């Protein structure tokens, strides 16, 4: 009896163990089949690239986590001697400048990849779109850009005088350009700001939360399935059916305040109604009134995209312009000489800085080219019928292909043999260069400048970013004489989704004859 019981017990254990083996074996076979189908994906077998990347997106995730993706990408193209590199089971990096128009042009049939899903904000448990039809030039002209720009420049100069110039203290300019950018874009978006410059730091943890959000997006961008598992899985939706991101809730409160304000004006006279601020929040609400299908969640998505494009990414460009201008004294001297020939009001008006100060404009263009703000590529998905690339190779439909702005921006055939260097002169006519040849060279550089994207899906925040950059750079150098605390040291560049530079501490002084009284 005892022996029979023991035998039965062991048989049950063996049966359970065998079942576990079968389950594990089935899972292993499924994974093996999945990875082999990835490796032998039709049309991509012959595209060179890292061996591991042909099986799984984990290779790209690891490179992003290492903060090496941008640095390693050019080396991959060089070592394989190929303009097409397979960096994922169904993902290809392209370094051929001839493909810019094919992939991103106005007549392209390429669609956006799953990248946009990982970038979308969460509101009430649902992802919200962030793309908004760009307003025409008349609409942009109605937005209170000049007022916002003047306010922000005056504020930052006052704070620099109070905190750094008079006390002779070092200024962490890498942080202050972000405070400036955030306050300015908030002024343009909702005609008020959160007071980053006044506080001299973060307010209510907004910048800290934004950084965490952008870091997460960098990881989710490398492997989109992480986002589906982490944020949008059924368990998370069940326990948090109306979850919203911290930043999304901040945008929600901004919109609610504006809606209450505009509703209070609806019953007033026409003259009083005309006093409504023509900022981005007003334009978003106007769009919703004309098209009721636009939800509050979509409005929050629009606003969030506006704030991110106009703050974090803009700060990257301004830091780059300041850093390289101070690192190369000849650039600083030539810029100051150009600024000294200007006798108009300060802050320098946008149109003058953009179109009448060629060397200042060249510095900004070079900063945009030299330091592409994002770690990732601008991804697109090939049309169902597939596509023939400029080198004659054919890619099947449904493949994600992209170009990295840094990779194209450093193409020597387009930007010159010194494409790895910071040289604003490349954007200007060379001594003795015929005008026709200069214009041809400039057109080629413009056509391959991906700083704000390219084609119909280019960055809708371009106008906002340019407004901030062209307002800050000339006014800062016209009034301030900066010098690095440790000029022999290089800055520190941190990367995940958006690059963040630091290590730019400097001493500030007013230039001779300049001061707060110089501001209009």
From Swiss-Prot:
Disruption phenotype: Impairs the production of viridicatumtoxin, but accumulates a new naphthacenedione intermediate, the 8-O-desmethyl derivative of anthrotainin. The keyword Phosphoprotein does not apply. It is found in: Membrane. One of its GO terms (cellular component) is membrane. Its main location: membrane. It is an enzyme of class 1 (oxidoreductase). It is a single-pass membrane protein. Coiled coil: none annotated. Belongs to the cytochrome P450 family. Disulfide bonds: none annotated. Its cofactor is heme. Keywords: Glycoprotein, Heme, Iron, Membrane, Metal-binding, Monooxygenase, Oxidoreductase, Transmembrane, Transmembrane helix. This is Cytochrome P450 monooxygenase vrtE.
């Amino acid at each position: 009896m005892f022996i029979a019981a023991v035998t039965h017990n062991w048989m049950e254990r063996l049966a359970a163990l065998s079942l576990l083996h079968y389950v594990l074996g089935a899972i292993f076979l499924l994974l093996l089949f999945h990875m082999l189908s990835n490796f032998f994906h039709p049309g991509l077998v012959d595209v060179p690239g890292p061996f591991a990347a042909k099986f799984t997106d984990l290779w790209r995730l690891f490179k992003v986590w290492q903060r090496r993706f941008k640095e390693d990408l050019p080396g991959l193209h060089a070592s394989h001697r190929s303009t097409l590199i397979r960096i994922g089971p169904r993902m290809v990096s392209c370094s051929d400048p001839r493909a810019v128009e094919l992939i991103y042009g106005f007549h392209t049939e390429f669609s956006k990849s799953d990248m946009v899903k990982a970038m979308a904000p969460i509101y009430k448990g649902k992802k919200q779109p962030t793309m908004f039809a760009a307003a025409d030039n008349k609409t942009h002209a109605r937005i209170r850009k000049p007022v916002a720009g003047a306010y922000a420049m005056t504020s930052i100069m006052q704070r620099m005088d109070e905190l750094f110039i008079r006390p002779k203290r070092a200024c962490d300019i890498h942080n202050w350009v972000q405070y400036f950018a955030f306050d300015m874009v908030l002024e343009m978006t909702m005609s008020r700001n959160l007071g980053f410059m006044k506080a001299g730091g973060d307010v209510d943890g907004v910048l800290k939360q934004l950084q965490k959000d952008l870091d997460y997006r960098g990881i989710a961008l490398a492997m989109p399935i992480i986002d589906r598992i982490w944020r949008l899985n059924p368990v998370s939706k069940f326990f948090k059916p109306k979850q919203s991101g911290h930043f999304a809730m901040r945008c929600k409160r901004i919109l609610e305040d504006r809606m209450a304000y505009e509703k209070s004006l609806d019953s007033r006279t026409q003259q009083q109604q005309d006093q409504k601020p023509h900022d981005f929040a007003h334009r978003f609400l106007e769009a919703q009134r004309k098209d009721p299908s636009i939800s509050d969640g979509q409005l929050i998505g629009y606003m969030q995209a506006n704030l991110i494009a106009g703050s974090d990414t803009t700060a990257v460009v301004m830091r780059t312009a300041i850093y390289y201008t101070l690192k190369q004294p000849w650039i600083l001297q030539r810029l100051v000489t150009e600024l000294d020939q200007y006798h108009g009001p300060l802050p320098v008006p946008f149109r003058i800085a953009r179109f009448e100060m060629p060397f200042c404009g060249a510095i900004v263009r070079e900063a945009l080219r030299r330091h592409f703000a994002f770690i990732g590529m601008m991804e697109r998905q090939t049309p169902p019928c597939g596509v023939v690339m400029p080198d004659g190779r054919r890619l099947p439909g449904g493949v994600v292909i992209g170009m990295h702005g840094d990779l194209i921006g450093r193409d020597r055939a387009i930007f010159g043999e010194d494409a790895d260097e910071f040289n604003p002169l490349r954007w200007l006519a060379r001594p003795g260069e015929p005008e026709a040849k200069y214009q041809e060279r400039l057109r080629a550089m413009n056509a391959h400048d991906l700083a704000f994207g390219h084609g119909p899906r280019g960055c809708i925040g371009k106008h906002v970013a340019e407004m901030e950059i062209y307002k800050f750079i000339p006014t800062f150098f016209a009034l301030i004489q900066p010098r690095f605390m440790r000029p022999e040291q290089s800055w520190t560049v941190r990367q995940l989704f958006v690059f963040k530079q630091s290590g730019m501490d400097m001493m500030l002084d007013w230039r001779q004859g300049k001061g707060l009284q110089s501001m209009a």
